Design a protein with these regions (language model features):
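Transmembrane signal-anchor helices characteristic of membrane glycosylation enzymes that use polyprenol
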Residues: 23-53, 139, 188, 212-230, ...
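Transmembrane-helix motifs of polytopic, lipid-linked glycan transferases
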Residues: 33, 99-122, 135, 162, ...
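Aromatic- and kink-enriched transmembrane "portal" helix at the membrane-lumen/periplasm boundary
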Residues: 42-45, 79, 87, 91-98, ...
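Specific aromatic-rich, kink-prone transmembrane helix
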Residues: 65, 111-114, 139, 143, ...
Length: 474
């Protein structure tokens, strides 16, 4: 594309003309997003939940409510938008953050539909096929699941869908840059979209795009100020340049990106392949292939979408964490225009796929009555001796207890200490600030910490599980 080109890069040459049905073209994405939101609100979790890889929810909510810094890269954009969601006058605090995810996911659906509408057949926008593709994204189980819980993936999906719409509809490169920057602040994997953005932008406008990108990254500069709060959730020490770089680069998790063992690789390949097929019931991927071969999109755009989707797939495959599969959500967004192009061949029949997805997945994904975590956490906290130190064994337990103590105010006399985080100097410094009477925080020696404090406070090893493990020593 040259600098003189102003046409949307998704369209075949000669296929662009002003569509007089502009109101209809606006309503299709809007109604699609609203339909998705309605289903999300019917199935949304009413409280804190670990469902759908949601165990980070307690930490993210606590960080937002207490103006803290979440796990790397800190997620400042989520922190600030969460504060807005927390102002809602109804529902539990956790529900309000779940609602933020639902709105974010519905926004992603609306913009994915708007992007798919840019595909034209004979000069006419494929509104019906675009709506069907948007709803197929909405009811894909991986995507739907993230719309119901407190996590960053739905918000990240919203920014990525807006970015793709901006790029493929020929919007301002400044806007595209800002949106990509914000997407990166909600998940570092969004850097994968940078080559796509450059390919779909005129080279003469790259400087404007980069300026927008830097503007979108500005929330990361708020992390040193958030770290000055009294929040229990402050990862790293972003008050120094080296500490800030450690945090925003996600260096803590570099070790997770590695080759799987030979025996694990086949199992992981099967898991990823099966999960991807499930998203669109297998048959949807046939329409993606049909869309690729339809030539309704500019070849370079098709190749760029496929290449970027494959990079996300490789990233998820080699990122060795339990929730790595969720990093494939952008792939579904990227392939939505291709799905719409394939759907254009069958018209209204394309709605069969989202309808089947809705029927097949509704029961399994419905979290409307999911409140299993609250009694588990309350049992641990209520049973603890007065002013005890509770030692947790890892993220799931400490994140959950943070929420119930700091957000809901349950048992604020207790001291929460995580055994895994104790190894970090910055975490022990945070404990010193929160609990000045604690001793034994100068070195990474948990046994010495126990011995130094068990004369003043009972110490309990606790774990928030179905068994509600709690072992205390006076």
């Amino acid at each position: 594309m040259t600098g003189s080109e102003t046409a949307s890069p998704i369209l075949k040459p000669g296929g662009q003309s002003r569509d007089p049905r502009w109101l209809w073209n606006l309503l299709v994405p809007l109604l699609t997003g609203m339909a998705a939101l309605m289903i999300y609100l019917i199935t949304i979790a009413p409280d804190l939940t670990w469902a759908n890889f949601g165990s980070d929810g307690g930490e993210l909510i606590t960080a937002s409510i207490t103006s803290g810094v979440a796990h790397p890269p800190g997620y400042p954009t989520y922190i600030f938008l969460g504060k807005v969601a927390a102002l809602l006058p109804f529902g539990s605090v956790a529900w309000r953050f779940n609602f933020l995810s639902a709105v974010s996911a519905a926004t992603a659906v609306a913009f994915a539909t708007a992007t798919a509408q840019q595909v034209r057949m004979g000069g006419t926008k494929i509104g019906v096929a675009a709506a069907a593709a948007g709803l197929s994204l909405a009811f894909a189980p991986l995507f739907w699941g993230q719309a119901l819980i407190s996590e960053v993936y739905a918000l990240n999906s919203a920014f990525l869908a807006i970015l793709l719409w901006s790029l493929l509809s020929g919007r301002s490169p400044l806007l595209s840059g800002i949106i990509l920057g914000l997407a990166i602040t909600t998940h570092l994997s969004s850097l994968i979209m940078l080559p796509l953005a450059l390919v779909l932008s005129a080279r003469s406008r790259w400087v404007i795009f980069i300026c927008g990108l830097l503007l979108g990254l500005l929330p990361l500069l708020t992390l040193p100020f958030l770290a000055r709060s009294s929040s229990p959730v402050v990862w790293g020490d972003p008050s120094t340049l080296s500490g800030w770089l450690w945090l925003v680069s996600g260096r803590l998790y570099y070790a997770n990106l590695r080759l799987p063992e030979n025996s694990e690789a086949l199992l992981r390949l099967f898991y990823f392949g099966r999960t991807l097929l499930q998203q669109w019931l297998g048959v949807g991927w046939l329409f993606v292939i049909l869309g690729i071969t339809s030539n309704l999109l500019v070849k370079r755009v098709t190749l760029a979408l496929i290449f970027t989707g494959l990079i996300y797939l490789l990233y998820g495959f080699f990122y060795q964490t339990e929730d790595a599969i969720v990093t494939l959500l952008p792939l579904l967004i990227l392939f939505s225009p291709l799905l719409a192009a394939g759907f254009s061949k069958i018209g209204a029949w394309s709605f069969v796929l989202p309808l089947l997805l809705l029927l097949v997945n509704f029961h399994a994904l419905n979290l409307h009555q999911e409140q299993s975590i609250r009694p588990l956490a309350e049992a641990v906290l209520i049973a603890a001796p007065e002013e005890a130190i509770l030692l947790t064994p890892g993220d799931q337990s400490i994140f959950t207890l943070w929420y119930f103590q700091y957000v809901e105010g349950l048992r604020d006399d207790l001291v929460l200490v995580d055994a895994n985080l104790f190894a970090f100097d910055w975490y022990r410094e945070r404990l010193k600030n929160l609990y000045p009477d604690l001793i034994g925080l100068d070195m990474d020696n948990l046994d010495a910490f126990r011995k130094s404090n068990n004369q003043e406070r009972p110490i309990c090893d606790v774990q928030v599980t179905l068994a509600g493990v709690a072992n205390c020593t006076p």
